[in-house]
């Protein structure tokens, strides 16, 4: 059973309270599930999707075994600092932003292009507001700043404004609270890191999953555990091995660096494929236009992402001749495509007002040596252009921002202006990088994994980047974290229902025997 949320016209939330009988039922269920054998869910992956599923199951009274092959939880989610999309929200209302589920959905459909799956995008967008509410109310996250990222027609990307935010993205809060819960409630939640799942346990027809086998990497011991399974193992954009899905489906991408952690190797995809699970669009990989070039290690295989929030605040992309070449807030595939046509380096440039708006990001990137403050003379030297050439670029941009002329590249939202030669600039070199695998395991709108014949595989759920098809050909910035929460919660609800159904079936069988 779910708690519903009713919105008044001011979007202020009024809770719908379950009946006393419902509360009693869940209390009884929690007791029964905690004392029965094999009544746990197994969540694989400790990123935002896995943590969302885990905490949803715990809230519904279930027990969880949380496995992660890494030595720390968080996955790629702890790198995501631009924020999470949602519409409509109280924060948008307070800031007089007119947005809706339909507007968000339409933006997402346009971005997804021919590969759009309307039913999944409708699920994603319609549950976005409740996802942000859940993060705020369940974990105390303060989402009090809005950004307009590339491809969005309204500011709808929510993030916090804590001074340490780039160092503590929202996933860190879930990691911390989940680990504390495990320490205080070991009967409800067990966590095992350094645990690599090697096989899904199924019936002979592969249409029912009832557990997994995993290896403890610290001592190489093998273990078998039982329960419905939630796969939240991430994508495969860091797998450069000979048997990688990248090499098999998108080999040209292997020449690029990645923003992904080394744990993103498609393990979950391969396990699902081995039991006849369906996949979709494995050849589609999102190449993000702005990965920082580290001056200390320019050819590094792993690069830091230059968050899209920088361009949202007003950053421009300039060639080594001091010229713009694209709408900086166009879709990611468009900006990347324009960059790849160039023969010269590209620099991300913020004026002082834009840098102030994203000051915590700038602080972090500057600390890492990825960005540098400079005056116009040094900027011209860096770009290998004259002051007159830079002044011409700035003048055209400022006039377009004022509405005096159309922008040459169609940019509509300009952020902090004007750009002036007397200002101080924050600058970093950027290149396209592997960022997100669009393809993955095929699920329905309840996060249930489907077989190649289109049927639901009982007891197997997936959420996060392992899931394919949600974002079509091109993902909007801020929608990856949203998909983790929305489909993570759905997977958690599904795993809880499966535990209940199997518990009742087991109890009935025992009683009749």
Swiss-Prot record:
UniProt-annotated binding residues for FAD: 41-55
Q: Which Pfam families does the UniProt entry name for this protein?
A: FAD_binding_2
Q: Which NCBIfam families match?
A: flavo_cyto_c
Question: Has the keyword Flavoprotein been applied to this entry?
Answer: yes
Name of the molecule in the record: Fumarate reductase
Cell location: Cytoplasm; Mitochondrion; Nucleus
- Which organism is this protein's natural source? Schizosaccharomyces pombe (strain 972 / ATCC 24843) (Fission yeast)
Q: Which gene encodes it?
A: osm1
Any idea what job this protein has?
Irreversibly catalyzes the reduction of fumarate to succinate.
- Provide the alphabetized UniProt keywords: Cytoplasm, FAD, Flavoprotein, Mitochondrion, NAD, Nucleus, Oxidoreductase, Phosphoprotein
Q: What is its main location?
A: cytoplasm
A single GO CC term for this protein reads: cytoplasm
Q: Residues where Phosphoserine occurs?
A: 100
């Amino acid at each position: 059973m779910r708690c519903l949320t009713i919105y008044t016209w001011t979007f202020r939330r009024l809770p719908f309270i379950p009946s006393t009988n419902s509360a009693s039922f869940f209390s009884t269920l929690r007791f029964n599930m905690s004392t029965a054998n094999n009544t746990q869910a197994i969540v694989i992956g400790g990123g935002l999707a896995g943590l969302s599923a885990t905490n949803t199951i715990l809230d519904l009274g279930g027990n969880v075994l949380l496995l992660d092959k890494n030595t720390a939880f968080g996955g790629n989610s702890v790198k995501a600092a631009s924020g999470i999309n949602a519409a409509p929200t109280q924060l948008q209302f307070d800031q007089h932003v007119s947005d809706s589920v339909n507007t968000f959905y339409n933006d997402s459909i346009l971005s997804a292009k021919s590969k759009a799956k309307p039913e999944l995008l409708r699920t994603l967008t319609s549950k976005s507001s409740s996802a942000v509410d859940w993060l705020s109310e369940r974990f105390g996250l303060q989402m009090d700043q809005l950004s307009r990222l590339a491809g969005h027609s309204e500011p709808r990307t929510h993030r916090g404004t804590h001074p340490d935010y780039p160092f503590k993205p929202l996933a860190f809060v879930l990691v911390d609270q989940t680990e504390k819960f495990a320490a205080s409630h070991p009967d409800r939640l067990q966590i095992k890191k350094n645990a690599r799942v090697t096989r899904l346990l199924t019936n002979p027809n592969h249409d029912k999953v009832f557990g997994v086998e995993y290896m403890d990497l610290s001592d190489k011991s093998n273990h078998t555990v039982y329960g419905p399974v939630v796969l939240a193992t991430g994508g495969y954009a860091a797998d450069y091995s000979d048997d990688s899905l990248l090499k098999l489906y998108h080999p040209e991408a292997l020449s690029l660096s990645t923003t992904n952690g080394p744990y993103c190797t498609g393990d979950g995809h391969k396990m699902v494929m081995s039991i006849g699970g369906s996949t979709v669009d494995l050849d589609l990989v999102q190449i993000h236009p702005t990965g920082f070039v580290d001056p200390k290690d320019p050819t590094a295989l792993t690069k830091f992402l230059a968050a899209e929030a920088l361009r949202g605040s007003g950053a421009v992309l300039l060639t080594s001749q001091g010229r713009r070449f694209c709408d900086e807030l166009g879709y990611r595939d468009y900006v990347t495509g324009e960059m790849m046509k160039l023969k010269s380096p590209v620099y991300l440039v913020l004026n002082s007002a834009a840098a102030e708006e994203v000051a915590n990001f700038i602080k972090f990137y500057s600390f890492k040596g990825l960005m540098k403050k400079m005056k116009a003379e040094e900027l011209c030297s860096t770009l290998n252009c004259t002051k007159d050439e830079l002044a011409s670029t700035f003048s055209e941009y400022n006039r377009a921002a004022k509405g005096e002329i159309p922008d040459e590249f169609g940019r509509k939202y300009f952020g902090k202006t004007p750009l002036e030669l007397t200002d101080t600039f924050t600058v970093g070199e950027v290149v396209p990088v592997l960022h997100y695998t669009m393809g993955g395991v095929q699920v329905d709108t309840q996060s249930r994994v489907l077989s190649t014949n289109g049927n639901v595989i009982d007891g197997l759920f997936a959420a996060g980047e392992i899931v394919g098809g949600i974002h079509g050909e091109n993902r909007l910035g801020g929608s990856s974290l949203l998909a983790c929460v929305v489909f993570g919660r759905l997977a958690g609800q599904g795993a809880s229902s499966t535990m209940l159904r199997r518990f009742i079936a087991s109890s009935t069988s025992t009683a009749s025997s």
